[in-house]
């Protein structure tokens, strides 16, 4: 398992060649069975193009404690692995979080842009000072989605009815809430 921290500093350094840099990084995480198969869609989902439009000072203000976050992610993975099998090739990519305009009045909402694109790839938008308990819960939820034996990988866009989506989300919620504190802001 690997963790990539696509930090504000890295994005700032890659700014002159950002499109090529993001294309290479994101495209390497996409396969023919990914939910999102276009690197620009992933970059847009995580507002990376918008982030690149910020000034250097604004970009760096979104920095987080990389060592602490790596430790939290590693510990969370170990906890989850006691209960479910995870893909050994799993790649967790952390990117800077920008607020969504429709939840701008809820501080915690900035940490809810998370996506499992395939059993080998989880993306998390992370704010500078995340609530660690909430981050653990959120990551456990996504790790549940990423488990290679999860029936989600039998679903396609053609056979993914709403009731299956509710089951998928509900089981991931139940699983993560059994392991970590309930810090959900939407409950």
Where are these regions (language model features)?
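Auxiliary, metal-adjacent structural segments of Zn-dependent hydrolase domains
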Residues: 53-118, 132
């Amino acid at each position: 398992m690997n963790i990539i921290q696509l930090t504000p500093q890295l994005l700032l350094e890659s700014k002159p060649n950002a499109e090529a840099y993001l294309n290479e990084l994101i495209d390497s995480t996409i396969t023919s069975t990914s939910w999102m198969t276009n690197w620009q869609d992933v970059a847009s989902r995580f507002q990376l193009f918008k982030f690149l439009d910020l000034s250097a000072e604004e970009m760096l203000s979104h920095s987080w404690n990389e060592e602490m976050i790596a430790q939290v992610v590693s510990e969370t993975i170990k906890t989850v692995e006691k209960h479910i099998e995870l893909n050994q090739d799993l790649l967790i990519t952390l990117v800077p979080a920008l607020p969504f305009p429709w939840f701008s009045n809820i501080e915690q909402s900035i940490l809810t842009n998370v996506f499992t694109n395939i059993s080998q790839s989880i993306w998390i938008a992370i704010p500078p000072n995340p609530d660690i308990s909430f981050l653990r819960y959120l990551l456990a939820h996504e790790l549940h989605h990423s488990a290679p034996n999860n029936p989600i990988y039998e679903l396609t866009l053609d056979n993914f009815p709403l009731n299956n989506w509710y089951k998928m989300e509900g089981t991931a919620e139940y699983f993560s809430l059994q392991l970590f504190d309930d810090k959900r802001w939407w409950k």
